[in-house]
């Protein structure tokens, strides 16, 4: 595999994981805070 000039796969997976966990965390926090009930 030639990965020159491209973003490393591990970096994409790590960044994607952080984004997903952050979004899920905000959604769960909003649900417990009562903000999720208004959606």
Swiss-Prot record:
UniProtKB keywords: Chloroplast, Membrane, Photosynthesis, Photosystem II, Plastid, Reaction center, Thylakoid, Transmembrane, Transmembrane helix
GO cellular component: chloroplast thylakoid membrane; photosystem II reaction center
Pfam families with a match to the protein in the record: PsbJ
Subcellular location: Plastid, Chloroplast thylakoid membrane
Gene3D superfamilies found in the cross-reference section: 6.10.250.2070
GO BP, one annotated term: photosynthesis
SUPFAM superfamilies on file: Photosystem II reaction center protein J, PsbJ
Membrane-spanning intervals of the chain: 9-29
Primary location class: plastid
Membrane topology: Single-pass membrane protein
HAMAP family membership: PSII_PsbJ
NCBIfam families, sorted: PRK02565.1
PANTHER family according to UniProt: PHOTOSYSTEM II REACTION CENTER PROTEIN J (PTHR34812:SF3)
Family to which this protein belongs: Belongs to the PsbJ family.
Subunit: PSII is composed of 1 copy each of membrane proteins PsbA, PsbB, PsbC, PsbD, PsbE, PsbF, PsbH, PsbI, PsbJ, PsbK, PsbL, PsbM, PsbT, PsbY, PsbZ, Psb30/Ycf12, at least 3 peripheral proteins of the oxygen-evolving complex and a large number of cofactors. It forms dimeric complexes.
Function: One of the components of the core complex of photosystem II (PSII). PSII is a light-driven water:plastoquinone oxidoreductase that uses light energy to abstract electrons from H(2)O, generating O(2) and a proton gradient subsequently used for ATP formation. It consists of a core antenna complex that captures photons, and an electron transfer chain that converts photonic excitation into a charge separation.
Protein name according to UniProt: Photosystem II reaction center protein J
Biological source species: Cyanidium caldarium
